[in-house]
């Protein structure tokens, strides 16, 4: 097989998906934004680290904004216009990521918090002495 034909077959096919789901996982150290179709297949994703932030800068709201913007752009290439948002975690980039999805041009249908809560599970980390 020639090199040109081989590279053409590797390119991802562009789907036309009008609606999807946006999963925002915001931890104390990072923010991951994943956009899927309605059945859960990943269309596009991004994270604070993938955008180019390292170390403690990954946990900032600005890094979450940039990650959400990059994920929204990759989803819009597949034709996504409307998303339902699921937010998980206690991080600082939760609201900023949602706002950034809106300003990127995605219409937000609903926002739901899916943060897991322990019913007396593992002992949480001790408070920091700063």
Curated annotation (Swiss-Prot):
NCBIfam families: PRK05309.1, uS11_bact. Belongs to the universal ribosomal protein uS11 family. One of its GO terms (biological process) is translation. It comes from Tropheryma whipplei (strain Twist). The keyword rRNA-binding applies. This is Small ribosomal subunit protein uS11. The keyword Thylakoid does not apply. Located on the platform of the 30S subunit, it bridges several disparate RNA helices of the 16S rRNA. Forms part of the Shine-Dalgarno cleft in the 70S ribosome. Keywords: Ribonucleoprotein, Ribosomal protein, RNA-binding, rRNA-binding. Part of the 30S ribosomal subunit. Interacts with proteins S7 and S18. Binds to IF-3. One of its GO terms (molecular function) is rRNA binding. InterPro entries: Ribosomal_uS11, Ribosomal_uS11_bac-type, Ribosomal_uS11_CS, Ribosomal_uS11_sf. Pfam families: Ribosomal_S11. It comes from the Bacteria. One of its GO terms (cellular component) is ribonucleoprotein complex. PROSITE patterns: RIBOSOMAL_S11. HAMAP family: Ribosomal_uS11. SUPFAM superfamilies: Translational machinery components.
């Amino acid at each position: 097989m020639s090199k040109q034909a081989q590279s053409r077959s590797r390119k991802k096919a562009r789907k036309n998906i009008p609606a999807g789901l946006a999963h925002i996982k915001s931890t104390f150290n990072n923010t991951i934004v994943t956009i899927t179709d309605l059945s859960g297949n990943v269309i596009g994703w991004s994270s604070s680290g993938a955008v180019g932030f390292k170390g403690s800068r990954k946990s900032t709201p600005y890094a979450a904004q940039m990650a959400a913007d990059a994920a929204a752009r990759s989803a819009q290439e597949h034709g996504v216009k409307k998303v339902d948002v699921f937010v998980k975690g206690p991080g600082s980039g939760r609201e900023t990521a949602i706002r950034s999805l809106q300003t990127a041009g995605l219409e937000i249908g609903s926002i739901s918090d899916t943060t897991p809560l322990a019913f007396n599970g593992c002992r949480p980390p001790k408070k920091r002495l700063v």
